[in-house]
Amino acid sequence: MGSYDRLTSLDASFLHLESIETPMHVGAVSIFEGEQFFDETGRFRLAEVRRLVSSRLHLIPRFRRRLMPVPLNQGRPIWVDDPRFDIAYHVRLTALPTPGNREQLMTLTSRIQSQLLDRSRPLWELWFVESLEEGRVALIQKTHHALVDGVSGVDVATVLLDFEPTPTYLQPPRWIIQPPPAQWRLLADSVWERATEPTEIIRTARAAVRGPQRALDETVRMIS
């Protein structure tokens, strides 16, 4: 196998079930006191927030990876490093009419969450919202189920941000982009995986003691 990881049957099912009417990402909204987010001139510290998030991306490697399909759809997609990863695309800033109230924030959140994530990029977005009443700042999180389940439901904001008055910028290791596998290798690996799926089915069934319903669902998907 190559140096990549493949979606599980469950994670891949989120992609298959997704449609414009049924988005398969999860969302959250948080509201914070705004003082720490603004500089002495009153401007939002967007560049600093992006730098802070960038310094922590190595803690969740998949947040710099995109989906890559298997040729001829002969298997589940894999995660590969995104060579055009752009932190500015994933960490954004918007604003409400001053002073924004909760109803306006929920309307904005609904609009953002109604849009599907771009599958050609890593499947997450963080939207900061300024101009809330009392000078507060909101954070709208948007992360695909296939990605969240793959990192065991990690609280993205807790890992990527630091809400202390003086945030800590980590010193991450240099990110070395790994090239995607050759198409022929990816196809060959998928064929081999399909040939060994009966073993995977047995393994999934044994896991039913820990999670009966989820294990059953995975087994059914692999058989069908």
Where is each model-derived feature located?
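Acidic, low-complexity proline/glycine-rich segments
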Residues: 9-21
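A general structural signal for short secondary-structure junctions and capping/turn motifs
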Residues: 20-22, 116-117
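Soluble acyl-CoA-dependent acyltransferase catalytic core bearing the H(X)4D motif
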Residues: 1-12, 29-42, 50-224
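Short, flexible turn/loop "capping" segments at secondary-structure junctions
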Residues: 21-25, 133
